[in-house]
Amino acid sequence: MEYSWLENKLQEINRKCIQINNKKSNNDSLNMIIGKLIDVMKDTSVLFKTLYERIIFNGSYYNNLKISKADEYDLDLILVLPVALETVLMLTPEAGYVDVKIDISKIKKLAYYRDILTPLEKLCENGIFSSLKIHSWFEGLVQKSLNIINASKYFPQYKLDMYKSGPAVTLTVHTPFSSYDMDLVPCLKLDKSLYPKGYKKQNCNHIYAVSKPNKDKEWRLSFIEQELSILRDNGHVKPAIRLLKFLRDQRDHKLIKSYFIVTVAMWDLETTNFNGKSLSFAFMTLLESLYKHICERKIPFYWNPNLNLLNKCHRDYLFNLENQLLNILKKLRSSNSNPNVLNEVFNFDIQES
């Protein structure tokens, strides 16, 4: 079915309702503060200095999928284990998670690693590099480094606070005019030779594993670079994802995480060519696919379809969501080509300019 009559209205919603308040001052202060924090963390911990490689700016803002002002930033601090440790990934019973096994005995006689041997051993449990222990170590290191920065008054114009938030250590920056959060997450970079069996392979040099504070030793696999590559240069897919996120928020369905919608889009990209197609085509394709997945009670994890992203959503919630999405699709299909139906769909009144 053709939905070109929705095009102008969707473009207007995308332009007016999903604006990112991209303040250059936020970006400038963020780069300055995180740069100093990394320097102090290196000075404070020889282990961090040895393992740290770089920052990957992740999340909706940097992937151009954010639908609100730029006051939250996701930063993955990439750590690389020495090759000499002969790292091995072991799949766990929970899909999407791995144990990271290392052999510390391999570096005991290497002078270069003498200073990190003891702190590295403290982060291991029976030869497993513990996600829980490294998260606790990372949290303490950030707090200690932040205390040094605040005591030294490096940034007298800002107030810096830290608190825990899920898998991240969150740093709040209070400026004279606003505030924003930086979510810092320790993340292992792993060679592609460690790619686990049963996972879909994509052209890449690395995979990543993210520390989870609610796990004992396990790490969650992450495919940051691969997902960026999949979503890049694919017509109006990203604007359509933003519209679906906006629809989700307007309908108060926060249990449908942004990553669920991104995953639906990645599956659609395997079977649909979005290049040269309209925003209305991309939006309706993703909306109909989301509805289909909700009806099936399954959004397969893109990298391992054995994992269902909806497995923690209550069946009553999914039943209600299914009915809501069906009603939305019915309204769009029976609206006699009236684009103002989107005001009702999005619970938002917007006039075309």
Curated annotation (Swiss-Prot):
Any one GO molecular-function label of the UniProt entry: RNA binding
Binding site for Mn(2+): 269-270
Keywords attached to this entry: ATP-binding, GTP-binding, Immunity, Innate immunity, Magnesium, Manganese, Metal-binding, Nucleotide-binding, Nucleotidyltransferase, RNA-binding, Transferase
GO BP field: innate immune response
Gene3D superfamilies: 1.10.1410.40, 3.30.460.90
Binding annotation for Mg(2+): 72, 74, 183
Binding annotation for ATP: 60, 72-74, 245
Cofactor(s) it depends on: Mg(2+); Mn(2+)
Keyword Nucleotidyltransferase: yes
Catalysed reactions listed for this entry: GTP + ATP = 2',3'-cGAMP + 2 diphosphate; GTP + ATP = pppGp(2'-5')A + diphosphate; pppGp(2'-5')A = 2',3'-cGAMP + diphosphate
Transmembrane stretches, start-end: none
Binding site for GTP: 183
Pfam families assigned: Mab-21 (PF03281), Mab-21_C (PF20266)
Catalytic class of the enzyme: transferase
Known EC number: 2.7.7.86
UniProt function note: Nucleotidyltransferase that catalyzes the formation of cyclic GMP-AMP (2',3'-cGAMP) from ATP and GTP and plays a key role in innate immunity. Acts as a key sensor of double-stranded RNA (dsRNA), the presence of dsRNA in the cytoplasm being a danger signal that triggers the immune responses. Directly binds dsRNA, activating the nucleotidyltransferase activity, leading to synthesis of 2',3'-cGAMP, a second messenger that binds to and activates Sting, thereby triggering the immune response via activation of the NF-kappa-B transcription factor.
Family of this protein: Belongs to the mab-21 family.
UniProt-recorded name of the protein: Cyclic GMP-AMP synthase-like receptor
